[in-house]
Regions:
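Conserved ATP-driven motor cores of ASCE-family P-loop NTPases powering translocation/secretion/packaging/pilus
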Residues: 400-402, 406-503
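Short linear proline/tyrosine/threonine-rich motifs used for host-factor recruitment
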Residues: 186, 604-606, 620-622
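Short edge beta-strands and adjacent turn/loop segments
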Residues: 588-602
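Residue-level detector of alpha-helical secondary structure
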Residues: 568-579, 583-587, 591, 621, ...
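Intrinsically disordered, low-complexity regulatory segments enriched in Ser/Thr/Pro
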Residues: 613-644
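Basic- and hydrophobic-enriched, low-structure N-terminal and domain-boundary segments
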Residues: 1-93, 97-105, 110-112, 469, ...
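Short, conserved catalytic or adaptor-binding loops enriched in Gly and charged residues
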Residues: 132-134, 330-332, 429-434, 622-625
Length: 650
């Protein structure tokens, strides 16, 4: 081979090497901004170890959300800074075995004890972790609607009753002292407890009657809420007067009382009872506008009320909520694990979950506010599985915004973003998301996969193209390198992930790691606490209904040819005031006074000896309570008849 030919081949080889390897490197260096179309990436191991707290699983000091595990799963890095987390996993994604049970395991074994509230639809978490928690010093409680005979008890009205009893106690002290300074002190304390009981009543009624964001006209739910507030207040007033026992103040008893109002006779009786109460009484002030509604409107309100309260007809629910055997704020005073076990095949029970969450949260806020630092002595994690299957938690925006500062951390488990939107609406859902980190486990829907892909963001990648032509005596070639955007993970890639977890903390880039199942964690111990059997009771005797009310019967000088029913006797008591007014004006001009009945309403017919004088007629009209009574004057021969009717009782 001649030297010129060898030289040509060497030159061509150098050009090819240059074009294929060296020029792309030069072009890459020349690119001005390799983040031009996006800078998304996953955190590096170095960044994870720098940003999060490392703990030895054999000696855990303080628990956060597990972000990363060492290969041998002897060490874990916790996120202790992100206030709350949303766990996104469709049905069958392994939320319990990869997220809930590991979290409970860490809490049980940590030196710094935190209480834990767990919604546990299948009872799976209780079965797998309760003994481990107990062995590590935890108080174990269950509210078990699957097995009510094994459940603890929680009277939903207990906090309200306790507050009202303090009001009664200090009111009695006020009446029994002549010391002016003590009177001021007792008066202020009494009224503060009364105000707090009213606040708790309003809060509970709001929790129970809360409607989804795209629900009915708010008028109906607000009216049903007022009905519940009024009935709770009525029960407390009856308790104060000694007419009912403490054990009769339950949600089921209130439900039965309202049911007993469904027939016309009992409804009228209750209206008369309200008429007798003084204005300023909580029950009267709340119920008066409702009982004065027209019949159709009132029936619609009671329809909403009955729909929301129907759950308390359930015998299991009635037994569990008939009394309380623990204090709601115990979770903020002593390391406690409370499991809420509900039949997940019947979503109506999730209403009770929302109610219990709201009650305990309110009690823990009160407890935290008593501390100088406004924080719980024993902090708490809320592990809320099937969160978006529950009716909305009232004022959830405030909960996620301020609960961290009080020592409360929430873990919300949902199946999709759409599920959250359906319960809270897009605006409130976004507030929840803005206050939470996100842990992605698995999805079956493309919409959710697209949302996760979008949240991960885009990265900038290179795109190279080469065109070349080689001839015997010449070479023509061209290579170009450009930048373009690509999703860090496409929706299809997100959807196809298997046993992988993506975590979006508030600090740093997203984290991509293998999913760890609880039985791989060396500090986990299997075991279930044996619970005491509590036989169910027939609670019929504890219900307070209108039929069971004992009305006061007073003597009267009026004559009657009829044997008046208890209801008519109550009407008679109200009519007596008007009769006395007329008697004081007409004195000895009355011949007789009789009770009559018209359209099942009692009225009084007063027969005078003579015709009533115009002057006396004017005086009677001026003195009689025209808001309560309606007068009719008629003449028959030389005598006058006065009819005294009750107006609408409420």
């Amino acid at each position: 081979m001649s030297s010129p030919l060898i030289f040509v081949l060497i030159v061509i080889s150098i050009l090819i090497i240059f074009l294929k390897y060296i020029e792309p490197m030069i072009n890459k260096y020349k690119l001005k901004n390799d983040n031009e179309y996006g800078s998304a990436r996953f955190s590096t191991i170095y960044e994870i170890k720098r940003n999060f707290k490392k703990e030895n699983l054999s000696n855990i000091k303080r628990v956060g959300v597990p972000i990363y595990y060492s290969k041998n799963i002897k060490y874990v890095w916790f996120d202790t800074e992100t206030p709350h987390y949303i766990y996104l996993g469709s049905s069958g994604s392994g939320k319990s075995v990869t997220a809930v049970i590991p979290m409970v395991t860490f809490l049980a074994n940590a030196k710094e004890k935190r209480s834990v509230f767990i919604t546990d639809p299948k009872g799976e978490i209780f079965h797998n972790t309760s003994k481990m928690l107990k062995d590590n010093g935890y108080n174990i409680l269950t509210i078990d609607f699957r097995n009510p005979c094994l459940s603890n008890h929680i009277n939903i009205l207990e906090s309200i009753i306790c507050e009202y009893e303090k009001y009664i106690e200090y009111e009695k002290l006020l009446k029994n002292t002549n010391d002016k300074e003590k009177q001021k002190e007792y008066n202020n304390i009494s009224l503060s407890h009364y105000a707090e009981s009213n606040r708790l009543i309003s809060s509970l009624a709001e929790i129970i009657m809360q409607e989804k964001v795209e629900g009915k006209d708010p008028f109906w739910n607000n009216s049903a809420r007022n009905l519940l507030e009024g009935l709770i207040s009525f029960f407390l007033e009856e308790y104060k007067e000694g007419k009912i026992k403490r054990e009769q103040i339950t949600m089921t008893s209130i439900r039965k009382f309202q049911t007993s109002m469904m027939n016309d006779k009992n409804e009228r009786k209750f209206k008369i009872l309200m008429e007798q109460k003084p204005y300023g009484t909580k029950s009267k002030d709340t119920l008066t506008p409702l009982l004065s509604m027209n019949e159709n409107t009132y029936k619609s309100v009671t329809g909403v009320f009955n729909e929301k309260m129907a759950i308390f007809d359930d015998i299991n629910v009635a037994n569990i909520t008939a009394q309380s055997d623990f204090e709601l704020n115990i979770l903020g005073r002593k390391p406690t694990a409370l499991f809420i076990i509900v039949p997940d095949e019947d979503k109506v029970y999730y209403t009770l979950v929302t109610i219990i969450i709201g009650l305990i949260y309110k009690e823990l806020v009160k407890l935290a506010n008593k501390n100088t630092v406004k924080k719980l002595d024993i902090e708490i994690d809320w592990l809320l599985d099937e969160f978006a299957n529950c009716p909305p938690i009232a004022d959830i925006e405030s909960v996620v915004s301020v609960s961290r500062s009080r020592g409360m951390r929430f873990h919300f488990f949902i199946q999709s973003f759409a599920q959250l939107d359906n319960v809270y609406g897009k605006e409130v859902s976004q507030i929840i998301l803005d206050n939470c980190g996100l842990i992605y486990l698995k999805t079956n829907t493309m919409d959710t996969a697209e949302a996760v892909s979008k949240r991960l963001g885009k990265q900038t990648i290179e795109s190279s193209s080469i065109s070349q032509s080689i001839q015997t005596i010449s070479y023509n070639g061209n290579q170009s390198t450009s930048l373009m955007a690509r999703e860090l993970l496409t929706p299809d890639e997100v959807k196809s992930l298997h046993y992988k977890t993506i975590i979006f903390p508030n600090v740093g880039y997203p984290i991509f790691r293998d999913t760890v199942i609880f039985n791989k964690i060396n500090c986990y111990k299997l075991g279930e606490v044996i619970r005491e059997i509590r036989p169910l009771k027939n609670l019929t005797s504890t219900y307070y209904t209108i039929d069971a009310m004992n009305s006061k019967k007073e003597n009267s000088s009026l004559t009657s040819n009829n044997d008046f029913s208890e209801f008519q006797q109550m009407e008679k008591q109200i009519l007596q005031e008007g009769i006395d007014t007329i008697k004081n004006i007409l004195h000895n001009k009355i011949e007789k006074i009789e009770y009559k009945e018209l359209n099942m309403r009692t009225y009084v017919l007063i027969t005078l000896k003579d015709k009533v004088e115009t002057k006396n007629k004017s005086i009677i009209k001026g003195k009689i309570n025209n808001k309560k009574y309606h007068l009719e004057f008629n003449n028959i021969g030389n005598k006058s008849l006065i009819e005294l009717h009750l107006k609408s009782l409420i």
